[in-house]
Amino acid sequence: MLPLLVVLMSVGSSEAENPLQMANVLPNASFEKRSQGGVEGWSSRSWNGDSDGIWTVAAAGRTGARSVSIASKKGLDAAWTATVRVKPKTFYELSGWIKTDKLQGAIGALVNIQNMPKVRTPSVTGTKDWTRVATLFQTGATTELEINCLFGGWGRSTGRAWYDDVVLVEVAGPREQAMTRATATVIIDVDSPSVEYNPMIFGGFIEHLGKQIYGGFFDPGSPLADEKGFRLDVIEAIKELKTHVIRWPGGCFVDSYHWQKGVGKDRQPYDDDRWGVVEPNTFGTHEFIELCRRVGAEPYICQNGLADTQEMADWVAYCNSTTGKFAEMRKMNGHPEPFDVKFWSVGNERSGRTYIHKVRDGAKAMRQVDPSILVTCSGSHGPQAHIDPYLLETAGKYLSLLSIHEYWVANYQRHQTPDYLSCMMLSEKPDAHIRGIVKAFDQANMQGQIKIAFDEWNLRSWHHPGFSGHNARKVDHKDPEIIALIKARDKSLQPSLYTMADALFCASFFNTCLRSAEDVEMANIACLVNQTGPLYAHPNGIVKRTHFHTMAMYANLLQKRVAKLELKAGSLRHGNQSVGVVDAIATVDETGEKWSIAMVNRHPSDAVACTTKMGETLLDGTYKATILSGHSPDAYNDIEHPDRVVPKEVELIFNNGIVELPPHSLLMIQLQDRS
């Protein structure tokens, strides 16, 4: 029988997705049709425990008007049960949505099959909002199934659980070879020249949106902040990431930002017409430079793409000049020495001929002030890796970098919570995206002359319903609808969103950048703090999300050069999509003696036997390694449990070249540290 592929996904009930629009085998799956004493097609039953069970048809459902629930104060095994006919030797997915209140003891709440006891979804316990659970299975010879919305385990579960939108659908089964255990082979080329990569791929991005800046790392008045308003705990955590470059102030925010209003003592709050909030304007150029200096990052400033080129040139003069009007202004504001900002962008996520001319003229104007700066502009944002040839033809000779943006789960208007496997199916998309950009450079005969700055990237975008960011919108800040839209942005802060899917997608993204080291100069995770970032700052402290640890491992444990390797791996499939089950990268120091290898096993539940060779030699022996994994692919860190997912140092045994890669894990292996 196929090993069960389990999926756990949590969302708020107001953002729940519709049930699968397929042929649902189950009757009355949303429990909308009542029958005498219950719901049509389902019956209540109990097994072990006290007889205090309460089966209820609840007046509110995840979707529709109803759901069903089970409750017990003393302990119970109980279910709502439906019996259905199915095809033999056929793959099905069983899923449902569960909400719980103080559910504890034994297993909890889940959906299972009574006459196929090994087929069961993950369980939900505690107090949780609507949570999707699912499992994939094959029926074998069975033609009839008893489906349980199950509560309990050994008669000891207490609390209450609600069930809704239970779905049993036939799905395409994996190919025959996927039925066998996945394997992989990594052959590291020890003879070909290695390539030095730019550590600026470990960069960050911050924007005046949500709680990234205010209420994030900059929070004057917080007991955790210093006299200048910087949260010291957040600053120390950012240092762990070895963040080499930080991009600011936007993002779409920059299209209404005028830098002179954010320097000096007389700073006035103003309406940010991009994000519909009042910008306090207390974090400006000087504060940004101080942030960068504190964490050891290069500052990267994105200019207002709607401003005139003189305003752009003046900002460069303010930051970098030693003499003149703007140098004197900077000195009057407390900084006699220039900031020496090296990286400047002309606008954010803009396109068209008017913009391209602005890029050309803005780059020329800025470089007249400081010829040493490196200029970038908006090249591609969104899933299509398309670069306007006119941009490269008109402004290419003034550019050192080209800004690329992509978020592979677009949460802008609709908050989505795809499951682990769906996220893994996206993990090879960055590689295809970068290849498309490089092809555009090649067609313009500019490969090697302009490098890629992937200066906004993340698996998930942040949530900002009602505001596109690209269009100005005047709002009434007292309007209840506007208040609700602004509040909805906090959905991006939910700890349960950031699972091993985020950690391993992040690893795959870095592997892509490392493989493309000759073309990718910079990458900035969006964002660095709060929203979808690796670091969650709350009023009482911080939580290092799963992808924080991925970033820290890559920034601290790799060597400085990328070696070639050949990777052969089986496929991990989900529906009609597939990716390699293993991803890997090898790095080496300048001497060729120290090696660090990163290996990712994307499989949610199975270990992978990986054969590793250094040239023609099978790797053998015990080596020190660092592993990042969790108790399940859906493991996450939160305020109550900040260390569910943390890196651990282990000793890894290679037996005749073969090493076991644990499921849903990242391994960083130090070959020089042989035990």
What do these predicted regions represent?
Residues 521-594:
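Glycan-recognition and catalytic regions of carbohydrate-active enzymes
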Residues 175-418, 431, 435:
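N-terminal catalytic cores of secreted or lumenal carbohydrate-active enzymes
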Residues 1-10:
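Bacterial N-terminal signal peptides
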Residues 615-639:
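Solvent-exposed beta-hairpin/edge-strand motifs
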Residues 579-619, 625, 667:
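Carbohydrate-binding surface patches
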Residues 502-532:
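Substrate-binding cleft of secreted/luminal carbohydrate-active enzymes
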Residues 15-187, 191, 262-280, 298, ...:
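Extracellular and organelle-lumenal recognition/adhesion modules and their flexible linkers in secreted
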Residues 354-510, 568-578:
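Noncatalytic carbohydrate-binding groove/subsite architecture in carbohydrate-active enzymes
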